[in-house]
Amino acid sequence: AEGIHLNDPLMSPIYETCAELGMPLNIHVAEPYWMYLPDDKYNDGLMNGKKWKIDMSIPGMQSHEQLIAQFSEAVKNHPNTLFVACHFINCSYDLSIVGRLLDEYSNLYVDMSARFGETASIPRYMRKFYTRYADRILYGTDNGMSAEMYETTFRILETDDEHFYVPDYHYHWYYSGFDLPD
């Protein structure tokens, strides 16, 4: 809530300097959507809610929608700056938002880091999404560099394996492979 937001004019010198240097700006936007939702039976992220939660009762706290809108405005206002939004812009709950922004802004890229828990349960949709935006999705990780992490990543991206679990990722959804083309 406090501080400078992504669409604040005070951020413009950073964006413009990145553009002048041809340096992409890797940026985190918001948090996963469920962190902003009430703790009730409809909140899929509730299992992680004790550890990760946004307290929306704090005066001035920005909603998920507001943060995405501010980011979108910053990307729009700085077309010569390359933005790389981590974690599918934290919109993995509705990737049509990501698709709309990628379609609208040619200077926007996303990374896939730490979002298989939300996306590997919808493999057909993800295969289409990754295929459509193949040149705009970057690899990233927030999960360390263990052999198991890479094996899981490649299993999801490259195979058509169905309904498997990865216990150390702390999600209750199953995973399925996207069977992406080369």
Q: What name fits each language-model region?
A:
Residues 1-97:
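Divalent metal-binding pocket/active-site signature
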Residues 66-73, 82-182:
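H/E-rich (His + Asp/Glu) clusters that bind or coordinate divalent metals
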